[in-house]
Amino acid sequence: MAPRAGQRGLWSPLPGLLLLAAALSRPAAPCPFQCYCFGSPRLMLRCASGAELRQPPRDVPPDARNLTIVGANLTVLRAAAFAGGGEGATDGVRLPLLTALRLTHNNIEVVEDGAFDGLPSLAALDLSHNPLRALGYRAFRGLPALRSLQLNHALARGSPGMLDALDAALAPLAELRLLGLVGNALSRLPLAALRLPRLEQLDARVNALAGLGPDELSALERDGDLPQPRLLLADNPLSCGCTSRPLLAWLHNATERVPDARRLRCASPRVLLDRPLIDLDEARLGCSDGDAHESGEGIDVAGPELEASYVFFGLVLALIGLIFLMVLYLNRRGIQRWMHNLREACRDQMEGYHYRYEQDADPRRAPAPAAPAGSRATSPGSGL
């Protein structure tokens, strides 16, 4: 029945509501296989599928912001691996909004040149805990916005040229702020990392650093308003000889740039084993070779702590001496009487000994010798 004139239609809003419900119930694009999506749009994806995942998922939504892959078997990261690159790929999906990429514990051994092409907004990359054996000289190209790079426990198994490759790969990262190189058995720090203009912190703990040379220390200096980078160097086998003088002088002048300066300890020579480096005096560190250096010959171990203890001991002795003099001064009259009485007693004793000596030495007081037995006594006038 048609509605009467002037009467509002009861079913007129129904088509609009149906259209709205259909729009809201429209199924969203599914998550990549073996991944979990969080947020809408998919701000975060987590893929932890085990060893069967051998390459990054190619159907990652283009609006993804964070991507985490843990526990996979991504042995080789080929060029444009996260933009659909790799073997058999002709056209990959770009991820223009991806800002954080975490790839820890994925058994990654090789990172080829341009492995992260197609990620222009990437700001944080974590490759920690992967047995990297080869790193492309341009592995981190195409990452103009990268600010944090974590390579902790990832380079220890690398080839002898790994440090050179790392130097070349880090050079184009002009916006890098944080660099993690913990537990990589590094014998030196990559100079390219130290020269990054905006670097704020370099974490190089638990490595094989025996010290920092003049070239490394000079690369840490910045001119103008650029930030002065901080270093974390704890748990490195530092050699506390004459070669450590530049590092020790730099530490004394820039302690605030090494937050763990008190944890820097000597590993050699033996005489300085486990001594805090910052407590030593660079002028006292001698240079020796071979066994002499190992035994500590030529190295003066009297550091500020020992000198301070000597000064404190001297002050204590001076205080004790001052107290002793004050006691003597306050009791001077009693001490004088005691000395006088002692002198008189000694005099009386000596006079007694002198009197006895005089008596014993007088011959008239000597007794007459006794007559021998059987002899007859005679008088002086008997004539016999």
Swiss-Prot record:
Carbohydrate attachment residues: N66
InterPro entries from the UniProt entry: Cys-rich_flank_reg_C, Leu-rich_rpt, Leu-rich_rpt_typical-subtyp, LRR_dom_sf, Wnt_signaling_inhibitor
Protein localization: Membrane
SS bonds (residue pairs): C31-C37, C35-C47, C240-C266, C242-C287
Comp. bias (Low complexity): 367-384
Signal peptide: 1-30
Keyword Membrane assigned: yes
Transmembrane segments annotated in the record for this chain: 310-330
Domain of life: Eukaryota
Protein keywords: Disulfide bond, Glycoprotein, Leucine-rich repeat, Membrane, Repeat, Signal, Transmembrane, Transmembrane helix
A single GO cellular-component term on record: membrane
Secreted in keyword set: no
Side Extracellular, residues: 31-309
LRR repeat segments: 61-84, 95-118, 119-142, 173-196, 198-219
Annotated Gene3D superfamilies: Ribonuclease Inhibitor
All ranges on the Cytoplasmic side of the membrane: 331-384
Main localization of the protein described in the UniProt heading: membrane
Region span, Disordered: 361-384
Membrane-topology descriptor: Single-pass type I membrane protein
PANTHER family: LP06937P, TROPHOBLAST GLYCOPROTEIN-LIKE
Protein name: Trophoblast glycoprotein-like
Originating species: Mus musculus (Mouse)
Upper lineage: Eukaryota, Metazoa, Chordata, Craniata, Vertebrata
